[in-house]
Regions:
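Short amphipathic alpha-helical segments with heptad-repeat character
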Residues: 1-5, 9, 118
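Conserved small-domain helix->loop->beta segment predominantly found in fold-type I
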Residues: 9-82, 101-109
Length: 136
């Protein structure tokens, strides 16, 4: 797990500094809304992060075909890095128990959707380069 967590921090910091990335959610980043709580509750911060960009759905198609190291797959936890796009409209279509206010709050938070990235054991510099070549 330590390698997952170290790699995830490096990738989260890379994404947070990328001009096309609007938001990165990783509890290890000081910018995370619950970073202080996470520091109290966790020894480390996991290998899972989310990020948001404009036109995320369009980029999802490009990621499926152009990522070379990170695999486009819907799964959690693996020795390989995995990424998937979670579109807000798709999520809302299956969120029957949420009120209108809750759905509006989620859309405000997520925009048109977020990427979920499960960071694996690959070299974090290679992962950042892989993301950079797709993000442009």
């Amino acid at each position: 797990m330590q390698s997952h967590e170290t790699n995830a921090m490096a990738v989260a910091q890379f994404l947070e500094g990328h001009p096309k990335v609007n938001k990165v959610l990783y509890p290890g980043l000081a910018s995370h809304p619950h970073h202080d709580l996470a520091k109290k509750q966790m020894d480390n911060f996991s290998g899972m992060l989310s990020f948001q960009i404009d036109k995320g759905a369009e980029l999802a198609q490009k990621m499926m075909s152009e990522l070379e190291i990170i695999h486009y797959a819907v799964s959690l936890g693996h020795h390989r890095s995995l990424i998937c796009w979670m579109g807000t409209d798709d999520l809302m279509a299956s969120s029957y128990g949420l009120s209108g206010d809750a759905l509006a709050a989620y859309r405000d938070f997520a925009g048109d959707g977020v990427y979920r990235l499960s960071v694996g054991l690959e070299d974090p510099d290679d992962l950042c380069e892989d993301l950079a070549q797709v993000l442009g």
